[in-house]
């Protein structure tokens, strides 16, 4: 496809339609947390977390380039992906907000790598920042996994068709 043809295709896709179609695919919801070199904690909610590689163990998430939380996490050079349970919608909303103190009143502990692990999560994956790639209006952030743990058998929080819920096996 030529560059001109690719541009025509790209501009012909309505962003709302694109979002509506991709909303048919359920995603897990995570809180990515970090502590910067000055000891200030930051975090953000993401619905774009995925595994990348088993060997070496790599994971990824895709923050919006306009995010105010991502630069703080990037500055830390390490982060923890907290897989939220279906009982943690409030935590999700807190980490999706512009609130500067997302950890106020929240129970957490620090990983061996120094990133916050939120109490009540289904699992957590602690990472060093491996690489960052620009991709349209987002970044692709790759983390090198240092440690990971399942914390509970609760259902993970899912986002599907614009709403939140849990998982029930059929």
Swiss-Prot record:
Top enzyme category: oxidoreductase
EC number: 1.5.1.37, 1.5.1.42
Keywords: FAD, Flavoprotein, FMN, NAD, Oxidoreductase
SMART domains registered for this protein in UniProt: Flavin_Reduct (SM00903)
Record-linked InterPro entries: Flavin_Rdtase-like_dom, NADH-dep_flavin_reductase, Split_barrel_FMN-bd
Comment on pH dependence: Optimum pH is 7.5 in Tris/HCl buffer.
Pfam families reported in the protein's UniProt record: Flavin_Reduct (PF01613)
Tagged with keyword Nucleus: no
Catalytic activity as recorded in UniProt: FMNH2 + NAD(+) = FMN + NADH + 2 H(+); FADH2 + NAD(+) = FAD + NADH + 2 H(+)
GO molecular function: FMN binding; FMN reductase (NADH) activity; riboflavin reductase (NADPH) activity
Thermal characteristics: Optimum temperature is 30-35 degrees Celsius. Has a half-life of about 80 minutes at 25 degrees Celsius.
Induction remark: By (+)-camphor.
Residues involved in NAD(+) binding: 51, 138, 159-162
Job of this protein: Catalyzes the reduction of FMN, and to a lesser extent, FAD, using NADH as an electron donor. Is able to provide the FMNH(2) required for the Baeyer-Villiger oxidations catalyzed by 2,5-diketocamphane monooxygenases and 3,6-diketocamphane monooxygenase. NADPH acts as a very poor cosubstrate.
Family: Belongs to the non-flavoprotein flavin reductase family.
Subunit structure comment from the entry: Homodimer. Likely forms a loose transient complex with monooxygenases for which it provides FMNH(2).
Identification of the protein by name: Flavin reductase
